[in-house]
Amino acid sequence: MKKVIDWFKWLGKTEFVELKDIDCSEDPVRPELDLKFRTSYDRKIFGLKHDDKIEGIMCIAFTKDVPHTVRELDLMSRISHYEKDSDSIIAYTVWSRKRGAGKKIMEEALKFAKTKGFKRIVTLSPLTPMATHYHIRNGAKLLGHNPTTQNFEYKV
């Protein structure tokens, strides 16, 4: 049991930080989205930092509605950027480099959302068993299936 506890001990020494640059080709979900897309119209990239290394990455957008495609995400985040009316964070890609980082970065994103006054975090997830299990295990509720994506909701 002690080995398991020691294995995840590093998670207590992490920091949720905004990133200005990442290697987009590392993204296992949406590698086709370039850095400009990920950082324009109030879209942001966050990392889970431990000992000067980024162990988890999450790309988010701010919207008022729930997108079902990347195109809708783009349009909705542009509208919210200009209208300044977003109330939801859309996590459209999450990945980790170290065991436990995926869960921890979602926990940190929920804290961030709460401190910034957002109502919820909604995902724009691929239709894969891995994505489904990740979100259900972390406490999200399935909002719906779309032709190419699925949405899960985390209450803040």
Q: Each predicted region: which residue ranges?
A:
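A short, internal acetyl-CoA/4′-phosphopantetheine-binding micro-motif in the GNAT/acyltransferase core
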Residues: 89-101
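Short amphipathic alpha-helix that is part of the acyltransferase structural core
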Residues: 1-40, 45-50, 54
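Conserved beta-strand-loop-alpha-helix junction that forms the acyl-donor binding cleft
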Residues: 96, 122-133, 148
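Conserved GNAT-family N-acetyltransferase fold
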Residues: 56-58, 94
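Conserved catalytic-core motifs of GNAT/GCN5-like acyltransferases
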Residues: 136, 141-154
